[in-house]
């Protein structure tokens, strides 16, 4: 699957805090496996999505494919996604890597308006 080169693990994948993005984390960035999602909304619909993860190919697969499906959806529709949906969206992962489905689901569950520091 071809994905924009800028998607992969670059700092620009995180929007500025001033963008009014929603942010959710599955796992703790810098402390092992994690997936972080930032959504920018326009009229209740996802206009832009940025993701970061720990860099494992399985984490990249899940975040890339989730990003493709989340863009253009409402927050209500996104919050209805369950683990089975994410597994279907992301495709099969190698043995022992299924926890990335759960990390993505947790990041979605934890989506909150990002606070300015």
Segments from the language model and where they lie:
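Domain-level signature for proteins that mediate thiol-based redox and metal-cofactor handling
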Residues: 1-117
């Amino acid at each position: 699957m071809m994905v924009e080169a800028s998607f992969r693990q670059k700092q620009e994948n995180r929007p500025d805090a001033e963008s009014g993005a929603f942010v959710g984390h599955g796992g703790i960035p810098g402390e092992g496996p994690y997936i972080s999602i930032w959504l920018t909304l326009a009229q209740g619909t996802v206009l832009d999505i940025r993701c970061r993860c720990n860099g494992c190919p399985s984490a990249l697969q899940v975040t890339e494919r989730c990003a493709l499906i989340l863009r253009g959806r409402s927050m209500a529709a996104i919050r209805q996604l369950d683990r089975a949906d994410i597994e279907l969206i992301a495709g099969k992962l190698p043995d022992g890597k299924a926890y990335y489905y759960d990390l993505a689901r947790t990041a979605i569950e934890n989506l909150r308006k990002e606070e300015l520091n």
